[in-house]
């Protein structure tokens, strides 16, 4: 955290992926606007066609001081620092079916927040190895605020995520061979 300029008591949200509207990144920004009276830091890692519009939206919502756009990171170690520094990994995409980024976050004890019913959310059990929230902006914002104030629970769920979501490549290859 120190290397990234993050104070020890800052609550940190993270998104890693393409900055495209299909990833539901607007939903993240709009939820953050609803909780901007609660201290947090948000890091968007990646790039994409919506990056500039996302930055404009963040400025428009008055979130410039707590939201940082990191850009594309090609060094695995640099990306790992952000995963390790984050308290929660925000992944409200309804578009993805098996995002590796959720497993990468879990490997570093960072639980994901996903939308109930999203295909990718099938790997999570709410409050056990991640957090599932209805596809409703107010519900999403309220849950984020609640989790900011309960870092012990977030940490506990992150530990469980690292045990239940992370899979070895041997397991993945075995499952693919079994299915196909």
Feature names for model-found ranges:
Residues 11-34, 42, 49-55:
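A conserved mid-protein helix/loop that constitutes part of the nucleotide-sugar donor-binding site
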Residues 55-73:
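Nucleotide-activated donor-binding/catalytic signature segment of Leloir-type glycosyltransferases, i.e.
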Residues 94:
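Aromatic "clamp/platform" in nucleotide-sugar-dependent glycosyltransferases that forms part
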Residues 72, 80-86:
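Short alpha-helical donor nucleotide-sugar binding micro-motif in glycosyltransferases
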Residues 169-180:
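C-terminal alpha-helical cap of glycosyltransferases
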């Amino acid at each position: 955290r120190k290397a990234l300029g993050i104070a020890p008591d800052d609550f940190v949200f993270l998104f890693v992926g393409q900055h495209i509207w299909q990833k539901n990144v607007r939903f993240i920004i709009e939820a953050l606007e609803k909780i901007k009276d609660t201290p947090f830091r948000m890091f968007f890692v990646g790039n994409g066609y919506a990056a500039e519009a996302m930055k404009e939206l963040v400025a428009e919502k008055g979130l410039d001081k707590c939201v940082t756009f990191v850009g594309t990171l090609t060094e695995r170690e640099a990306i790992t620092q952000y995963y390790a520094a984050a308290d929660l990994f925000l992944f409200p995409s309804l578009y993805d079916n098996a995002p590796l980024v959720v497993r990468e976050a879990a490997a570093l004890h960072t639980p994901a927040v996903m939308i109930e019913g999203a295909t990718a959310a099938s790997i999570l059990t709410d409050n056990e190895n991640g957090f599932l929230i209805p596809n409703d902006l107010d519900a999403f914002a309220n849950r984020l605020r609640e989790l900011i104030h309960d870092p012990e629970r977030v940490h506990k769920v992150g530990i469980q995520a690292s045990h239940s979501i992370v899979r070895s490549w041997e397991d993945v290859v075995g499952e693919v061979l079994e299915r196909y």
